[in-house]
Curated annotation (Swiss-Prot):
Annotated gene: PG1
Repeat recorded as keyword: yes
EC number: 3.2.1.15
Protein's name according to its UniProt entry: Polygalacturonase
Organism: Penicillium digitatum
Annotated signal peptide: 1-18
Superkingdom per UniProt: Eukaryota
Keyword Protein biosynthesis in record: no
Positions of glycan attachment: N318, N336
Annotated PbH1 repeat ranges: 161-191, 192-213, 214-234, 243-264, 272-294
Reactions it catalyzes: (1,4-alpha-D-galacturonosyl)n+m + H2O = (1,4-alpha-D-galacturonosyl)n + (1,4-alpha-D-galacturonosyl)m
Length: 367
């Protein structure tokens, strides 16, 4: 039996119309791109896109811009101004998780945390309840690059991840100097491995970097201004109290309370080992150029060091620069026998005063 050409066309059309719709997973694999203009739409549709553009999103008060559990390989781009409604709560304002995720910012974008609405000079120590800014928790084998951030209410990036790189992150909280910004840490790292933070440009009122636990962490090429300097710790009294194999290098700390510091907690246990500070330039430091102490309690030094968190294999080399006349150039206060095998070379600080209160300084170090 012969089939006419018209009949063949009809059969072909029927076959096409009967073809099932591509499943969501196929859309991701084929490179679908989605642009979202609301936080609600982004949360609902994030699983259907391989590229997500967040376009001028205004996140409602008390809600998180939720980019957790993204499909592997997803790219996320912040475009325009991302802003957040005001409410007293703990946050976070933004949250990401997933594997092989790549987060970046389009030209001219800004993520505005709205800090002045919360700032009251008290940070997380009282007053208004303030949201943390950005959780990179379980964001593994991923990158965050080229983000421009302004006015975080309190802490900026909370990092709990493995093999995460953050490059060219700018955080400008300089308005907080006059408007009550406090506890505006830029990067807090805990229980993480193989973290690299490169080329950061930070203006804030607390630590530029604080590593509380983790291993194989690098901070390189950073500029830190206005805060408390670059810190290890405080280490102790957490679930994880081990800091190991950290390199902080080729960075600048200016107009800050401290240059570089290592802090461990009074009567706590843990360990700090294999930490290197190298080629750090300091300028106009107000309190301490280099400070290492084992006496912290409730966020403040006690003057009574303990030895439960030993600091070993510490290298401080080529830390140079200027301090205010009221600042102390170097302060070291260790517990009995808990600081050992340090390398100290090429450090040169001027303008400040010598400390008369150092204790248990290990061989090779200078105080």
């Amino acid at each position: 039996m012969r089939t006419s050409f018209v009949t063949m066309l009809a059969l072909g059309a029927a076959a096409v119309s009967a073809a099932p719709a591509a499943p969501v997973t196929d859309l991701v694999e084929r490179g679908s791109s989605c642009t979202f203009t609301t936080a609600e739409a982004a949360k609902a549709g994030k699983g259907s896109c391989s590229t997500i553009v967040l376009d001028n999103i205004k996140v409602p008060a008390g809600e998180t811009l939720d980019l957790t559990k993204l499909k592997s390989g997803t790219q996320v781009v912040f475009k325009g101004e991302t802003s957040f409604g005001y409410k007293e709560w703990t946050g976070p304002l933004v949250s990401f998780s997933g594997s092989n995720i790549h987060v970046s910012g389009a030209a001219g974008h800004v993520i505005n945390g709205g800090g002045p609405s919360w700032w009251d000079g008290k940070g997380t120590n009282g007053g208004k309840k303030k949201p943390k800014f950005f959780y990179a928790h379980h964001l593994d084998d991923s990158t965050i690059s080229g983000l421009n951030v302004k006015n975080t209410p309190v802490q900026g990036f909370s990092i709990l991840a493995d093999r995460l790189t953050l490059d060219h992150i700018t955080i400008d909280n300089s308005e907080g100097d006059a408007k009550g910004g406090h506890n505006t840490d830029a990067f807090d790292v805990g229980s993480s491995t193989f973290i690299t933070i490169s080329n950061a440009n930070i203006k804030n009122q607390d630590d530029c970097l604080a590593i509380n636990s983790g291993s194989n962490i690098k901070f390189v090429g950073g500029t830190c201004s206005g805060g408390h300097g670059i810190s290890i710790g405080s280490v102790g009294l957490r679930d994880n109290n081990i800091v190991k194999d950290v390199t902080i290098s080729d960075s600048t700390v200016i107009n800050s309370d401290n240059g570089v510091r290592v802090k461990t907690i009074y009567q706590a246990t843990g360990a700090v080992s294999g930490v290197t500070f190298s080629n750090i330039k300091l300028s106009n430091i107000a309190k301490y150029g280099i400070v290492i102490e084992q006496d912290y309690e409730n966020g403040s030094p006690t003057g009574k060091p303990t030895n439960g968190v030993p600091i070993s294999e510490l290298t401080i080399e080529n830390v140079t620069g200027t301090l205010k006349s009221s600042a102390t150039e170097v302060y070291i206060l260790c517990g009995n026998g808990s600081c050992k095998n340090w390398k100290w070379a090429g450090n040169s600080l001027s303008g400040g005063k010598k400390s008369g209160k150092c204790g248990n300084v290990p061989a090779g170090a200078s105080c």
